[in-house]
Amino acid sequence: MAAVSLRLGDLVWGKLGRYPPWPGKIVNPPKDLKKPRGKKCFFVKFFGTEDHAWIKVEQLKPYHAHKEEMIKINKGKRFQQAVDAVEEFLRRAKGKDQTSSHNSSDDKNRRNSSEERSRPNSGDEKRKLSLSEGKVKKNMGEGKKRVSSGSSERGSKSPLKRAQEQSPRKRGRPPKDEKDLTIPESSTVKGMMAGPMAAFKWQPTASEPVKDADPHFHHFLLSQTEKPAVCYQAITKKLKICEEETGSTSIQAADSTAVNGSITPTDKKIGFLGLGLMGSGIVSNLLKMGHTVTVWNRTAEKCDLFIQEGARLGRTPAEVVSTCDITFACVSDPKAAKDLVLGPSGVLQGIRPGKCYVDMSTVDADTVTELAQVIVSRGGRFLEAPVSGNQQLSNDGMLVILAAGDRGLYEDCSSCFQAMGKTSFFLGEVGNAAKMMLIVNMVQGSFMATIAEGLTLAQVTGQSQQTLLDILNQGQLASIFLDQKCQNILQGNFKPDFYLKYIQKDLRLAIALGDAVNHPTPMAAAANEVYKRAKALDQSDNDMSAVYRAYIH
């Protein structure tokens, strides 16, 4: 295939990872953003998603030449919105060109009329005028506006100077209609975090900093800037403000349902231990976003699917840790987490100075603190990062990540957290994330038990369960969680999205957390008893919504 010449400002179709070709525009990267080594590539701003990425030239195609082809093979609402955004951009550009041409014509007519009125009568003066105009045009070059020489001799400014002031804008200066496609300079980083939950909207102008930007973009800049310390100081200042106001730092990840051009995968080798309901979705998204991943699972057969998708196989946890830079683990409970680290061929045997371990399991604070101590004692770096969500959210890359421990490691995990979740919170020292996660799941588990209790009460009092759900969905309690769990119960579908045995485990640990600080948890304790009854009815491996069966038996 013949090589296609591309340049700054061209509209293109860009292919990123496994995502379909997406319409974008070649733009200038931020000032200090390093270009990846290797093959030639361009910095592309994608329409519709506001994402951006370095794209290899062989993954780019001219927009107009391949428009019909791409529209035929790609479908979906987001894709159509992106194409519509391109067409709107083209219409604005065309309209501006027509307006500019019309204005130029009007100016020319007005100047010609003025020249007719002030034109000298003598032949010598006409020749002087012609020579004078010729000099001006020669100095101004092609495309410059004609200016009357008669007025130039009388005015305070030379024709050339006035013509330069009236000339079109200089190349490189973005037109106002293209402001939403302009890449911010690194100097605008100071204004890039408007708040802990700032959404990623990239609409800079030439004179003001970016506002409401995704703080994950800071990590993208830091990973590729030649002067990360300068950028980091501005970012840290904003983060400190968030910490002072909320007690934590929140980082909003890019919308994982969009084309994640903003996710530049880390060049670090990633390991992942544990391919259960949550771990499987996490690994799948890491691979989709281009990370290099080595997997291990106690049941080796679960690794096969991911090997086919491009993952590497580790024979033991120790081998995975020793061959990877950052190793994540997601297992079921405190005992499994300890066995994984301290057991034969465990994580600890692979830890050397500089190796990083991120435990995503939901465990108690004492367990995670113990694990952190043994990892750090071997020269390793430790981060706890339990996740709030379920299997579907894991598959969709929309988990909420609660992290605590090594702040630098948290920053290093940025692209991984973007791939697997929609939001991440940094909560300070080790143990804080474990406590927060247990509290979150305590609330969720208690709420689920209350939902089941309400549905059964409606049934025994002769009320319609469906009507109860409809009423709840129209009120302040309306949520995806409420609707999904009620639908599970009404349909008798208890396929696990969050195992009942695990929510009961979290309730038990949350109650113990309350006991440790002498804080009463009567609601959680009551809910825990209902889940224990459901487990006795052989519902452990069903979804948490199967707690409903504890009320009807």
UniProtKB/Swiss-Prot annotation:
Signal peptide limits: none
Residues annotated as binding NAD(+): 271-285, 362, 505
InterPro entries hit by this protein: 6-PGluconate_DH-like_C_sf, 6PGD_dom2, 6PGDH_NADP-bd, GLYR1_PWWP, HIBADH-like_NADP-bd, HIBADH-related_NP60_sf, NAD(P)-bd_dom_sf, PWWP_dom
Cellular component annotations (GO), alphabetically ordered: chromatin; cytosol; nucleoplasm; nucleosome
Start-end of Basic and acidic residues biased regions: 92-145, 162-182
Swiss-Prot/TrEMBL keywords: Chromosome, DNA-binding, Isopeptide bond, Nucleus, Phosphoprotein, Ubl conjugation
Residue numbers spanned by region Disordered: 92-188
Residues of the DNA-binding region: 168-180
Location(s), subcellular: Nucleus; Chromosome
Cross-link Glycyl lysine isopeptide (Lys-Gly) (interchain with G-Cter in SUMO2) per UniProt, renumbered positions: K135, K176, K179, K201, K211, K227, K237, K240, K269, K302
Site (Required to promote KDM1B demethylase activity toward histone H3K4me1 and H3K4me2): F217
Modification Phosphoserine occurs at: S130, S167, S540
Coiled-coil residue windows: none
Keyword Ubl conjugation among UniProt keywords: yes
TM segment ranges: none
All residue ranges annotated as the PWWP domain in the record: 8-66
Interaction with histone H3, as annotated region: 214-217
Disulfide bond residue pairs: none
GO MF annotation list: chromatin binding; chromatin-protein adaptor activity; DNA binding; histone binding; NAD binding; NADP binding; nucleosome binding
Protein family (similarity comment): Belongs to the HIBADH-related family. NP60 subfamily.
Domain notes: The A.T hook DNA-binding domain is required for the interaction with MAPK14. The PWWP domain is a H3 reader and strongly binds DNA.
Function per UniProt: Cytokine-like nuclear factor with chromatin gene reader activity involved in chromatin modification and regulation of gene expression. Acts as a nucleosome-destabilizing factor that is recruited to genes during transcriptional activation. Recognizes and binds histone H3 without a preference for specific epigenetic markers and also binds DNA. Interacts with KDM1B and promotes its histone demethylase activity by facilitating the capture of H3 tails, they form a multifunctional enzyme complex that modifies transcribed chromatin and facilitates Pol II transcription through nucleosomes.
Protein name: Cytokine-like nuclear factor N-PAC
Source taxonomy: Eukaryota, Metazoa, Chordata, Craniata, Vertebrata
Name of the gene this protein is made from: GLYR1
